[in-house]
Amino acid sequence: MSPGQDATLLERSIKIAFVVALYWVVSISMVFLNKYLLSEVSLDAPMFVTWFQCVVAVVTCFILGELRSYHPALEMFPRFAFDTHVAMKVLPLSLVFVGMIAFNNLALKFVGVAFYNVGRSLTTIFNVLLSFFMLQQRTSMPALLMCGVIVAGFFVGVNKEQEQADLTMAGIMYGVLASLCVALNAIYIKKVMPFVDNDMWKLTAYNNMNAIFLFLPVITFMGEIPDIAASEDVYSGNYWFLMTVAGLLGIAIGLVSMLQINVTSPLTHNISGTSKACAQTILALQLNDESRTATWWLGNVFVLGGSLGYVLVKRAEMKRDLEKVPSSADSKA
């Protein structure tokens, strides 16, 4: 290998390491900051916190769209001009999106960060079930076996978390509902993308704009308005700073996820996400000075290992299907 190739390889390795580290920092920071806002501040208004993050997302998308002509890196962000017709087309997805982020934050409020990944681990299972019932797509036996490993890890984790920590049934149910909504969200995104010119950032803007209006009756129904009006936190600049940072991290995670996929691959992105979840669990236990039994850790290993195994199985199946296409074309010729 020539010196020039060595230098190029080193530069690429440094770039990959930087992007992966950035993804970890943004993702873990977002989880811990949301946990703080939902559990540690005196204002108990999880739907209001989620609503404000949607406001930050829309404002950020609008600003980035207006700045797109000032730098080539910003050209990926479209100018956001609200169209009622498009918003109505996106509305079914927005309803699922509201459920997803609402249940996600409620799950984070009622469970510890260390258990958060286990509590949200059934997304893959719901993906398989919804793909079968809504899209008539069957799942192979190896993939189903990996799903079985995930389910086993979930129940082991729930059982041991109940023994060692203050885990409520509400926390478990919110985690399950969040997983269901994440799976539904993935299906509806595919249906809605043509209405936004297959532009993910335009979809983000419309989705969050719809969510701003959809969350208002939810906030009222949950009785959060009197709590907001009576809270001293809303008069604290530090509170609004942290709320804004949390909203910006929500946008940033989409950016760094795409960046990580671009400089590596979708498979590496999934492996990085699994590794990050493990590091996040260890960090949460260290920061809270907590310990868990070997069986609790076994549940986590099942969840993370099953999730990674599912990704590897699906990748192998996709590769095999792609290899069949040229061979079938050759046989017809």
Swiss-Prot record:
It is a multi-pass membrane protein. GO terms for biological process: GDP-fucose import into Golgi lumen. Keywords: Golgi apparatus, Membrane, Sugar transport, Transmembrane, Transmembrane helix, Transport. The chain crosses the membrane at residues 13-33, 45-65, 95-115, 139-159, 169-189, 211-231, 239-259, 293-313. Signal peptide: none annotated. It catalyses: GMP(out) + GDP-beta-L-fucose(in) = GMP(in) + GDP-beta-L-fucose(out). Pfam families: TPT. GO terms for molecular function: antiporter activity; GDP-fucose transmembrane transporter activity. It is found in: Golgi apparatus membrane. One of its GO terms (cellular component) is Golgi membrane. It comes from the Eukaryota. The keyword Transport applies. Belongs to the TPT transporter family. SLC35C subfamily. Antiporter specific for GDP-l-fucose and depending on the concomitant reverse transport of GMP. Involved in GDP-fucose import from the cytoplasm into the Golgi lumen. This is GDP-fucose transporter 1.
